[in-house]
Amino acid sequence: MTSKLDQLKKFTTVVADTGDFGAIKSLKPQDATTNPSLLLKAASSESNDQMLADAFSGAKGDIGLACDRFAVAIGQEILKVVPGRVSTEVDARLSFDTDALIERSERIIGLYDTAGISRDRVLIKLAATWEGIRAAEKLEKDGIQTNLTLLFSFAQAVACAEAGVFLISPFVGRIYDWYKKSSGTDYVGADDPGVQSVTRIYNYYKANDFKTVVMGASFRNLNQIEQLAGCDRLTISTELLKQLAEDTGTLEQKLAPGNAGEARQSLTESQFRWASNEDAMATEKLAEGIRQFARDQEKLEALLSAKKS
């Protein structure tokens, strides 16, 4: 019998949301994504102690640079076992500073360049703030492809498409979490607000011939993944990938390019900020996500500092 994971791979590019090399090898995704939380977990593993030491020794006491060096080292190892791309995230504390985001992104891609990794195998992850989207627009023009993350609203998706970013990561599970907590309803199937959000974005992009890739992220259960089968890409935790690999039920394609979508839109900065202000869920989850990634970045810096002493 064919597993649901193998069925999914027929119409969706499967991406592993992990820094676990062993899991990546066994599950054989096309790409992999990392973030500060996953890097912190990897840094806490004794098996990566040498990688941490090397990252710090080459940073000349600059903790921020050491973190970037460690992130790139993890990315290099991942690229040894995936045929496609790895996403490496910029420090979330820079999410509201366009120039700083560009500078840090260029440093990260420079580290990959030095390691001999082709730029077409790396995506730079930025939070989908207005400043992050503007930074991505500039980076894309300079040949550095981006992954806009922490995406919770249609306004963010519209702005990302207009900016010509390579890929967006709408967060299915975190949208679901907010609405479940807000309403007390346990949404299932096509009624799931996270599923509805990604479906709307996907249909809008395809109807208007945007090339930006839609990669659903942050899944809480298999049903959410199944409802988005056919999406360009889905980045999935190792736990859920294993469940898909063990399930031999039938998986139907839910999303396809021919589905109807809304007319093309564009947003000025003030319109973007107003739309964001009017969307309580998106405002709260974006702020929460940036804070969480920033705290994990700080913990990673503390861990690196402790390792060197």
Swiss-Prot record:
Top enzyme category: transferase
Catalytic site positions: K125 (schiff-base intermediate with substrate)
Pathway listed: Carbohydrate degradation; pentose phosphate pathway; D-glyceraldehyde 3-phosphate and beta-D-fructose 6-phosphate from D-ribose 5-phosphate and D-xylulose 5-phosphate (non-oxidative stage): step 2/3
Superkingdom of origin organism: Bacteria
GO MF entry, a single one: transaldolase activity
EC numbers for this chain: 2.2.1.2
Keyword line: Cytoplasm, Pentose shunt, Schiff base, Transferase
Entry-linked InterPro entries: Aldolase_TIM, TAL/FSA, Transaldolase_1, Transaldolase_AS
Xref: Gene3D superfamilies: Aldolase class I
Compartmental location: Cytoplasm
SUPFAM superfamilies in the cross-refs: Aldolase
Matching CDD domains: Transaldolase_TalAB (cd00957)
Gene Ontology CC annotations of this record: cytosol
Gene Ontology biological-process annotations: carbohydrate metabolic process; pentose-phosphate shunt
Catalytic activity: D-sedoheptulose 7-phosphate + D-glyceraldehyde 3-phosphate = D-erythrose 4-phosphate + beta-D-fructose 6-phosphate
Predominant localisation class: cytoplasm
Family membership noted in the UniProt record: Belongs to the transaldolase family. Type 1 subfamily.
Name of the protein in question: Transaldolase
Organism, as annotated: Pseudomonas syringae pv. tomato (strain ATCC BAA-871 / DC3000)
Gene: tal
